[in-house]
Amino acid sequence: ATAQEQPEGEAPDKVESPVVXXXEAXIVLVNYAREADVDAMMKDAVDYWGQIDVIANNAGITVIALNLTGVFLCSQAATKIMMKKRKGRIINIASVVGLIGNIGQANYAAAKAGVIGFSKTAAREGASRNINVNVVCPGFIASEMTAKLGEDMEKKILGTIPLGRYGQPEDVAGLVEFLALSPAASYITGQTFTIDGGIAI
């Protein structure tokens, strides 16, 4: 299931996934910061598919409400379901800013650092039920937002990245796919993975 934040009353025409090209997807409009909405979303997913194997929390914009509260509520609701079958994987998307900070982004850095701390605790709590919890911290990823940056700002940003370029959405998706689905990731939990071109070196 794909849950996306959209203006009220609107829904995307389609869901594009760089990870699983032929997978079935359902679109759900939900307020991640409202516990009742999250619980209803999880119930709908279980009713439709029968279980929840993996969740990847990747919501943002409203800094604390979505970046931290939303991650907590979605992880909590999914864990209750995963505990019954003693298996599951949770991948929370934070940011390299949550590790190293950034001028003018105190609230964002605090929220993302909170996601990292929460995930480590959730990993300890879920381990006895075979629930893996990990964090992915992207750096600057090519997006509509970076496309709007001026030439001077882009040059300044690229100067902070040892690899000298933006990451691509597929870079992040590939790491999330590995953590979510690969048998080789079954012994990985409580870890924070940077995918940032070397910013946090």
Curated annotation (Swiss-Prot):
Keywords: Chloroplast, Fatty acid biosynthesis, Fatty acid metabolism, Lipid biosynthesis, Lipid metabolism, NADP, Oxidoreductase, Plastid. Homotetramer. It is found in: Plastid, Chloroplast. Its EC number is 1.1.1.100. The active site is at 108 (proton acceptor). It comes from Brassica napus. PROSITE patterns: ADH_SHORT. Its main location: plastid. InterPro entries: NAD(P)-bd_dom_sf, Sc_DH/Rdtase_CS, SDR, SDR_fam. One of its GO terms (cellular component) is chloroplast. The keyword Chloroplast applies. GO terms for biological process: fatty acid biosynthetic process. Embryo and leaf tissues. SUPFAM superfamilies: NAD(P)-binding Rossmann-fold domains. Pathway: Lipid metabolism; fatty acid biosynthesis. One of its GO terms (molecular function) is 3-oxoacyl-[acyl-carrier-protein] reductase (NADPH) activity. Pfam families: adh_short_C2. This is 3-oxoacyl-[acyl-carrier-protein] reductase. It catalyses: a (3R)-hydroxyacyl-[ACP] + NADP(+) = a 3-oxoacyl-[ACP] + NADPH + H(+). Exhibits a marked preference for acyl-carrier protein derivatives over CoA derivatives as substrates. Belongs to the short-chain dehydrogenases/reductases (SDR) family. Substrate binds at residue 95.
